[in-house]
């Protein structure tokens, strides 16, 4: 049983490492980044998040069936990625408002009143910040999943 839990944690780490690296590249390149790569980042990020949810459900099912880890830290590492993803999504939403506030715009509707070039610059800044936040969250999930794999004892 331990091998399956470790394998699951490693799959979660791998599925989150890829969007973390791709997102870091997209963030670094900014507006020069390939739009297809940016779309791929969001798809891979959601797959990574889904894997973390599936792993948490599997671990919860094992615990409900009486197969528990001997080290309670394992559960922290296995379940914390869900909280990280939730907080990251909130930060992603707040990052858009932060950019609007920096430019003195009250809401997203005000962006439509700007000239097209300014709209593009503003949207690019928002997307860059969102990608940065989410790729860092994926990196944190990688760390937590690797720690879960390292503490999966007693199954």
For each predicted feature, which ranges?
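Polytopic transmembrane helical bundles with strong interfacial aromatic enrichment
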Residues: 1-155
């Amino acid at each position: 049983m331990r091998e399956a839990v470790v394998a699951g944690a490693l799959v979660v780490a791998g599925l989150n490492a890829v969007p973390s690296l791709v997102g870091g590249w997209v963030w670094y390149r900014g507006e020069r980044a390939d739009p297809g790569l940016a779309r791929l980042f969001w798809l891979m990020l959601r797959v990574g998040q889904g894997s973390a949810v599936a792993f948490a459900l599997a671990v919860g099912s094992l615990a409900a069936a009486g197969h528990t880890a001997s080290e309670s830290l394992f559960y922290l590492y296995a379940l914390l990625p869900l909280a990280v993803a939730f907080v990251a999504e909130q930060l992603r939403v707040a990052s858009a408002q932060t950019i609007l506030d920096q430019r003195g715009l009250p809401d997203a509707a005000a962006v439509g009143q700007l000239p097209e070039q300014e709209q593009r610059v503003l949207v690019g800044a928002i997307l860059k910040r969102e990608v940065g936040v989410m790729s860092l969250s994926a990196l944190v999930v990688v760390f937590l999943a690797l720690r879960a794999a390292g503490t999966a004892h007693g199954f």
